[in-house]
Protein backbone atom coordinates (compact mmCIF):
# COMPACT_ATOMS: atom_id res chain seq x y z
CA UNK A 1 0.00 0.00 0.00
CA UNK A 2 1.25 3.46 -0.86
CA UNK A 3 4.00 2.15 -3.16
CA UNK A 4 2.64 3.39 -6.47
CA UNK A 5 2.55 7.12 -7.15
CA UNK A 6 -0.93 8.63 -6.94
CA UNK A 7 -1.12 9.27 -10.70
CA UNK A 8 -1.45 5.51 -11.35
CA UNK A 9 -4.93 5.72 -9.84
CA UNK A 10 -6.09 8.53 -12.11
CA UNK A 11 -9.50 8.00 -13.76
CA UNK A 12 -8.23 8.48 -17.34
CA UNK A 13 -5.74 5.59 -17.08
CA UNK A 14 -6.54 3.00 -19.76
CA UNK A 15 -7.62 0.06 -17.62
CA UNK A 16 -8.08 -2.15 -20.67
CA UNK A 17 -4.39 -1.79 -21.55
CA UNK A 18 -3.43 -2.50 -17.95
CA UNK A 19 -5.57 -5.65 -18.00
CA UNK A 20 -3.97 -6.74 -21.28
CA UNK A 21 -0.53 -6.21 -19.77
CA UNK A 22 -1.40 -8.33 -16.72
CA UNK A 23 -2.81 -11.05 -19.01
CA UNK A 24 0.36 -10.95 -21.12
CA UNK A 25 2.61 -11.46 -18.09
CA UNK A 26 0.31 -14.19 -16.78
CA UNK A 27 0.57 -16.13 -20.05
CA UNK A 28 4.40 -16.18 -20.14
CA UNK A 29 5.70 -19.74 -19.79
CA UNK A 30 9.33 -19.86 -18.70
CA UNK A 31 10.73 -23.09 -17.26
CA UNK A 32 8.69 -25.49 -15.18
CA UNK A 33 5.63 -24.55 -13.12
CA UNK A 34 7.68 -23.91 -9.95
CA UNK A 35 10.11 -21.62 -11.79
CA UNK A 36 7.26 -19.72 -13.41
CA UNK A 37 5.55 -19.00 -10.12
CA UNK A 38 8.77 -18.09 -8.30
CA UNK A 39 9.28 -14.35 -8.46
CA UNK A 40 8.30 -13.91 -12.12
CA UNK A 41 7.10 -10.36 -11.53
CA UNK A 42 10.31 -9.57 -9.65
CA UNK A 43 12.43 -10.90 -12.50
CA UNK A 44 10.48 -8.87 -15.05
CA UNK A 45 10.87 -5.77 -12.87
CA UNK A 46 14.61 -6.39 -12.57
CA UNK A 47 14.89 -6.84 -16.34
CA UNK A 48 13.29 -3.45 -16.95
CA UNK A 49 15.48 -1.80 -14.30
CA UNK A 50 18.55 -3.09 -16.13
CA UNK A 51 17.21 -1.84 -19.47
CA UNK A 52 16.40 1.60 -18.06
CA UNK A 53 19.84 1.82 -16.44
CA UNK A 54 21.47 0.92 -19.76
CA UNK A 55 19.45 3.58 -21.55
CA UNK A 56 20.49 6.17 -18.95
CA UNK A 57 24.21 5.47 -19.48
CA UNK A 58 26.43 6.69 -16.64
CA UNK A 59 23.47 8.20 -14.79
CA UNK A 60 21.86 4.76 -14.61
CA UNK A 61 24.49 3.74 -12.08
CA UNK A 62 22.63 5.91 -9.61
CA UNK A 63 19.99 3.25 -9.11
CA UNK A 64 21.21 0.01 -10.64
CA UNK A 65 24.18 -2.21 -9.88
CA UNK A 66 24.53 -5.20 -12.25
CA UNK A 67 23.15 -8.36 -10.66
CA UNK A 68 26.44 -10.22 -11.05
CA UNK A 69 28.25 -7.62 -8.93
CA UNK A 70 25.49 -7.52 -6.32
CA UNK A 71 25.62 -11.31 -6.05
CA UNK A 72 29.40 -11.28 -5.48
CA UNK A 73 29.12 -8.56 -2.83
CA UNK A 74 26.38 -10.41 -0.95
CA UNK A 75 28.21 -13.76 -1.14
CA UNK A 76 31.33 -12.09 0.26
CA UNK A 77 29.57 -10.82 3.40
CA UNK A 78 27.30 -13.89 3.87
CA UNK A 79 24.33 -12.21 5.59
CA UNK A 80 22.73 -15.27 7.20
CA UNK A 81 21.09 -13.26 10.02
CA UNK A 82 21.07 -9.70 11.26
CA UNK A 83 20.64 -6.14 10.05
CA UNK A 84 21.63 -5.27 6.46
CA UNK A 85 22.12 -1.58 5.66
CA UNK A 86 22.62 0.18 2.33
CA UNK A 87 23.18 3.94 2.78
CA UNK A 88 22.42 4.68 -0.88
CA UNK A 89 20.11 1.79 -1.73
CA UNK A 90 19.07 2.76 -5.25
CA UNK A 91 16.40 0.36 -6.48
CA UNK A 92 17.04 -2.13 -3.66
CA UNK A 93 19.00 -4.80 -5.52
CA UNK A 94 21.32 -5.42 -2.56
CA UNK A 95 18.29 -6.13 -0.38
CA UNK A 96 16.72 -8.50 -2.90
CA UNK A 97 19.97 -10.45 -3.29
CA UNK A 98 20.49 -10.58 0.49
CA UNK A 99 17.03 -12.13 0.93
CA UNK A 100 17.76 -14.56 -1.92
CA UNK A 101 21.05 -15.53 -0.24
CA UNK A 102 19.27 -16.29 3.04
CA UNK A 103 16.62 -18.41 1.31
CA UNK A 104 19.25 -20.31 -0.73
CA UNK A 105 20.99 -21.24 2.52
CA UNK A 106 17.83 -22.65 4.14
CA UNK A 107 17.12 -19.49 6.09
CA UNK A 108 13.82 -17.69 6.43
CA UNK A 109 12.83 -14.32 5.01
CA UNK A 110 12.68 -12.80 8.49
CA UNK A 111 16.25 -13.82 9.37
CA UNK A 112 17.56 -10.48 8.15
CA UNK A 113 16.24 -6.96 8.61
CA UNK A 114 16.58 -4.44 5.80
CA UNK A 115 17.55 -0.79 6.34
CA UNK A 116 18.49 1.83 3.81
CA UNK A 117 17.78 5.16 2.27
CA UNK A 118 17.92 6.83 -1.10
CA UNK A 119 18.24 10.52 -1.96
CA UNK A 120 16.58 10.45 -5.39
CA UNK A 121 12.76 10.51 -5.02
CA UNK A 122 12.09 8.47 -8.17
CA UNK A 123 14.70 5.88 -7.28
CA UNK A 124 13.35 5.72 -3.72
CA UNK A 125 9.95 4.80 -5.21
CA UNK A 126 11.61 2.18 -7.46
CA UNK A 127 13.12 0.60 -4.35
CA UNK A 128 9.76 0.58 -2.56
CA UNK A 129 8.19 -1.08 -5.58
CA UNK A 130 11.01 -3.62 -5.89
CA UNK A 131 10.65 -4.65 -2.24
CA UNK A 132 6.84 -4.72 -2.41
CA UNK A 133 6.80 -6.92 -5.53
CA UNK A 134 8.93 -9.47 -3.70
CA UNK A 135 7.13 -9.25 -0.35
CA UNK A 136 10.23 -7.94 1.43
CA UNK A 137 9.69 -5.79 4.50
CA UNK A 138 12.28 -3.10 4.84
CA UNK A 139 12.87 0.26 6.44
CA UNK A 140 14.05 2.67 3.77
CA UNK A 141 12.48 5.65 5.47
CA UNK A 142 9.14 7.39 5.04
CA UNK A 143 10.55 9.44 2.15
CA UNK A 144 13.71 9.96 0.13
CA UNK A 145 16.68 11.37 2.06
CA UNK A 146 20.40 11.97 1.60
CA UNK A 147 22.50 9.86 3.98
CA UNK A 148 25.10 12.62 4.41
CA UNK A 149 22.65 15.42 5.22
CA UNK A 150 19.69 13.59 6.74
CA UNK A 151 20.64 10.18 8.13
CA UNK A 152 17.38 8.33 8.80
CA UNK A 153 19.12 5.52 10.69
CA UNK A 154 21.46 7.41 13.06
CA UNK A 155 21.20 4.87 15.87
CA UNK A 156 21.28 1.75 13.68
CA UNK A 157 23.96 -0.77 14.55
CA UNK A 158 24.08 -2.74 11.31
CA UNK A 159 25.63 -6.18 11.08
CA UNK A 160 26.30 -5.76 7.35
CA UNK A 161 26.75 -2.67 5.21
CA UNK A 162 26.46 -2.94 1.44
CA UNK A 163 26.85 -0.08 -1.01
CA UNK A 164 26.97 0.38 -4.75
CA UNK A 165 30.45 0.86 -6.20
CA UNK A 166 30.53 4.32 -7.85
CA UNK A 167 29.87 3.26 -11.47
CA UNK A 168 28.48 6.67 -12.39
CA UNK A 169 31.72 8.60 -11.86
What are these regions (language model features)?
Residues 59-163, 168:
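Conserved S-adenosyl-L-methionine
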